[in-house]
Amino acid sequence: MKKFIPYLICLVLFTVFCCGIYGPVFLHLSQENYFAFDSEAMAFVLREPLGTLYWISRFLMLPLQNQWIGGIYLAILLTLLTWFTDRTLRVSSKWYGIGALLPACILIWAVSRGYNLFMRSEPSKVVFYIYAFLLLTEILALVISLFFKKKTSAEKSFKWPVGLLCSILILVLLNVGAWIYRQNLILSCDMQNKLLIADWDGMIEDALKAKNPDKSIAAFHAIALNQKGQLLEKMFEIDYDFPPTKLDDKDGLDESENFTAECNLFSCLPQPAYHYALCQQVVEGPRLRFLKMMIICSALQQEDALCSRYLAFLDKMPFQHEFVETWERRLENPQLTAEDPTMVRILQQVSFEDGFENDYARPCYIGFNLGVRRATPETLKASMAAALYCKDLDNVIFRAAYLKQIEALPTYVQEALVVASAKRPEILQQFPEISDMMKIRVSSFANEASPYLEQEDTSEVYEALYEKWGNSFLYYYYFGNRNRAVQDGFVTAVN
């Protein structure tokens, strides 16, 4: 019984990693998968090198559609690989558990890939490598046992479990290192998973956990705030100085493919969302996330026949029948869509303008909101948020005149108007609701910020001002999300 203790400990540590630390990533990985038993539906995989093996590994990925089941499933596989590796190495009891270094290397590789794990490669590679090494180590163990007999000797004296201690150390470091170096990836995947179940509060909490959010986190944070009706009140609660995302140079280095379709959909731009998802399907082959996006977008555009075709294609994938049934009922009875709170919120932002996607600047979800002139109150708020994000004060002034007719101007908007009044004093007369306290607040910020306006080193600015002023448009306008082009202390563009 004692010889199984090292493997039980490894199982616990692998479970912590696969269910907890990296659980959201593996769960999202299942959304980047598509599998069907129909070889025609899987032709995009089968025609690739190792296509048949990837088809099998995509099937073996199916348990990952549940975070706990998938995490425990992976932990068991990794523990088996540990045991098989020990058998292959024919280690003594002192070294039981040292085989965990092999599965740890697979996980280290997965962590090192970052967003590339699903944005730039076959999504089933992790499972593929685990099963490949399981098969290899078991074959080697059998061959070695046939040709070499292990010498047995009584081990009476106590021996430190060196192998187990080494494995515990490497697995603990793996868990800690993954959270430190891949925090943004873990949180953004968790936000995408929560988006599927409309857990807006959970998405907002995740965004606030990030020490230095990337573009994916900022995008999903904006979606959640917009769905909660809090975009103009809380959009600057996170830092917009995005760290670079390391991607393989395949079809460009832009990480926006991770969130563009969702941003378009939740801006009530179903045609651009559909178009983007379709392009990704053509380039990468069918993926569950984009396939569901195309179903929702075609349904919102009342393309019932097209939606039915996609539903039939999705129904070939195991465990997706519930989603298929839901949208089949909605096609038969559109009122069901109108009663879905998520869809209701999306449709509240419907455009009154007829235009083409190319009529607006890219990305469309920002370009449309900057360019739209006739819109619902909810679209007006999203449009104002886009103007604030882009530091477009002319657009802020134009939209504020309409926004004040339906609600009190939010703090961020008032700050932007006071900033604009430095060059156009008449703005303060146009918006008498701007209080003296707001003017004093802006003046106080100007006094504290003036020594740093010409400074390119943002780290010193961050330390001096962010704690007090970070959650404000004032800090964002002068110091946040700025590119290298700065003229007279004013930011000329954003990321």
Residue ranges with predicted function:
Residues T15-C19, L101-R113, L169-V176:
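Aromatic-anchored segments of alpha-helical transmembrane domains
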Residues F17-L60, L64-I69:
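Membrane-interface coil-to-helix junctions
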Residues A75-S93, L107-V111, A141:
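Transmembrane-helix motifs of polytopic, lipid-linked glycan transferases
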Residues S157-R182:
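Internal/C-terminal transmembrane anchor helices
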